[in-house]
Regions:
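Contiguous mid-protein beta-loop-alpha structural module that forms a pocket-lining wall or clamp
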Residues: 25
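Short, surface-exposed ligand- or partner-binding patches at beta-edge/loop junctions that are enriched
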Residues: 136
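Short hydrophobic beta-strand that contains or immediately precedes a catalytic carboxylate
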Residues: 10, 95-99, 115
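His/acidic/aromatic-lined binding-pocket segments of jelly-roll/cupin-type domains
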Residues: 5-11, 28-29, 52
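Short, small-residue-biased leader/transition segments that mark boundaries at the very start
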Residues: 1-2
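Rhodanese-like catalytic fold shared by cysteine-dependent sulfurtransferases
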Residues: 15, 19-22, 35-36, 41-50, ...
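Conserved nucleotide-binding/hydrolysis modules and their immediate coupling elements
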Residues: 32
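Extracytoplasmic/periplasm-facing segments of secreted or lipoprotein envelope proteins
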Residues: 89-90, 95
Length: 172
């Protein structure tokens, strides 16, 4: 995979982001100068889930995975313990469960809202930038990507360290 280990910033030009769903190409987003892509796969260490194609002539800047982690991922991700997360929630913060609806329905945390990772970008205009958000999933894989995306857009996002699997008393 050509783009697997890089984070890209569009210096100039326009791009289309598409994903194959049921054999049909679905337009997910149109990107322009200043926008970036590739962060979800690098943060969550997951497989790329979309194709980005230039719509016009342009220039892309790229960071390799090591530089991305050192310069962007680690400075933006704020991991917190379950105790600190509960304190933030008690002071008006909000749990965000980024798992699939079927997982959320089965064992969500009290008061949590469900915004699956694939929908996080769609929530940018709805969430309050003045509120603390504690993001979680089972293992920290999806939640780290979601917390990064939120923090990158200026939200006060915190990552539940270890996810639900490493916090067995979380649901109490």
């Amino acid at each position: 995979m050509l783009f697997r280990s890089y984070y890209y910033v569009i210096e100039s030009g326009k791009c289309r982001v598409e994903r194959m769903v049921g054999g049909v190409s679905m337009l997910l987003a149109e990107l322009k100068s200043g926008d970036a892509f590739g962060e979800e796969a690098l943060v969550s260490e997951a497989k790329r889930n979309a194709t980005v194609t230039m719509k016009s002539d342009g220039t892309l800047l790229r960071l390799d995975k090591q530089d991305f982690v050192a310069l962007l991922k680690e400075p933006l991700l704020q991991r917190i313990s379950m105790d600190e997360a509960r304190q933030r929630i008690a002071m008006g913060g909000q749990w965000i469960d980024v798992r699939y609806p079927s997982e959320y329905q089965y064992d969500k945390l009290p008061g949590a809202i469900n915004i699956p990772l694939a929908e996080v970008r769609n929530a940018f205009g709805v969430l309050n930038q003045g509120r603390d958000y504690v993001v979680y999933c089972q293992s920290e894989r999806r939640s780290s990507a979601a917390a990064f995306l939120l923090a990158q857009r200026g939200y006060r996002a915190f990552l539940l360290s270890g996810g639900l699997w490493n916090n067995p008393g979380a649901r109490a």
